[in-house]
Amino acid sequence: MKFESLASSSTGNVYIVSDRDTRILLECGVSHKRLKELTGFSLSEFDACLVSHEHKDHSGCAAKLIADGTRVYMSQGTALALGLE
């Protein structure tokens, strides 16, 4: 298993947890364009994204990921705060 920290600050948080078969984003707190630049992957290559809470530096492009077909997991409260439920 591999853990990568690609962005970690109040301006955005993005981490990747992966193994040979699975690639998961932890947090998506940057723009969709920046997320593509940071990861170096097509976002369709991610199996899922986990968002811890609604602050933009953790959830910035959650709606875009969902629209693009990525499974994004979060609490019901976070989804409500982001207007996604």
Please place each PLM-identified region on the residue numbering.
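Conserved beta-strand hairpin/beta-sheet module of binuclear metal-dependent hydrolase folds
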Residues: 1-39
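Active-site metal-binding motif and surrounding structural segment of the metallo-beta-lactamase
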Residues: 31-78
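A short, active-site helix/loop in glycosyltransferases that binds the activated sugar's phosphate group
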Residues: 80-82
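Short, conserved SAM-binding/catalytic segment
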Residues: 85
